[in-house]
Amino acid sequence: MSILSFLLGEKKKTASVAKERLQIILAHERSSHSAPADYLPALQRELVAVISKYVKIGNDDIKVNLERQDNLEVLEVKIEIPQA
């Protein structure tokens, strides 16, 4: 190990980065095959209604996603807010 590589740290190999990305994609695909929660569309509509009181947004500006892994459920909400 050279001093330069010690100071700068080792870079991840391209294969390991690709493997990590593939694992993330596979986990997402597996979770999307399960039945979606019934409340997600209503939740998305209500979020649009509440946020629209303060900022002009549309239905396409909010993405709601529910991911399930083993005993864990993660609710992800992405909101695109226009710049002032």
Curated annotation (Swiss-Prot):
Domain of life of the source: Bacteria
InterPro entries, sorted: MinE, MinE_sf
Keywords, ordered alphabetically: Cell cycle, Cell division
SUPFAM superfamilies: Cell division protein MinE topological specificity domain (SSF55229)
Keyword Cell cycle: yes
GO biological process terms on file: cell division; regulation of division septum assembly
Pfam family, one: MinE
Family, as annotated: Belongs to the MinE family.
Known function: Prevents the cell division inhibition by proteins MinC and MinD at internal division sites while permitting inhibition at polar sites. This ensures cell division at the proper site by restricting the formation of a division septum at the midpoint of the long axis of the cell.
Entry protein name: Cell division topological specificity factor
Organismal lineage: Bacteria, Pseudomonadati, Pseudomonadota, Betaproteobacteria, Burkholderiales
Gene of this entry: minE
